Amino acid sequence: MTAPLPNRHTRTAIIDRTRVIIDYRTGSTTVLTGTALARWLDALEQSAAPAPVAVQASAISWGTSESAACLPLLPRPPWRWALAAGVLLLCTLGVRQFGSRGTRFGRLVRLAEAGRNLPPPPREQAALAVRSVRWVARFLPARVACLEESTAASLLLACRGRGGAWRHGIATDPIRLHAWICDIHARPVEEPDQTDDYTPLNTPAATAKRHR
């Protein structure tokens, strides 16, 4: 796959001697080495793209990890949270489905970052938002993965006057992507310990800093 030219929508992740390019408009991911990498770095020098992010090494897992054999029990959240989560999750799924398939990822990213300039949420509020979305998602006959779940939770927090909580990151061994919600201290909320393996690519510091 040919990588796009560096621009404000692209993120460059540094992993050893390679670079992983993620296009936040399309969700495409490209691994560059050798001559292709050299061309990318030359173009990056002249672009307004965010600076590359150094990815922390993940614990060696040989591409495997443990997970629960069944879904954990989730207590019902307060009704006003559950109702709001249901509406916003349906909105998220609608944005995902309606529109060009090639820009689906970009639409969800814009939705997830709608409240990025709001004050960050305390941990208890962020956790309630995530649990509310997960509780509602179990009743919907639709695919709700980390991107959809975290987007809906971010919207729910924005409705409560909190934002800047959505994170999207990359991990190694193997290279993989994940989206989650963080608290006021930038710690993952309602996430397994393995989420610490991911290096966020869209923190305010990472996206504000330009390569030049």
Question: What role is predicted for each listed range?
Answer:
Residues 30-51, 120, 132, 193-212:
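A signal for specific C-terminal beta-sheet/loop modules enriched in small/flexible residues
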Residues 4-6, 50-52, 72-78, 119-122, ...:
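Proline-rich intrinsically disordered, low-complexity coils
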Residues 22, 149-212:
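Hydrophobic/aromatic-rich core segments of domains that either
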Residues 107-137, 160-163, 167-184:
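Small beta-barrel nucleic-acid-binding modules, principally OB-folds
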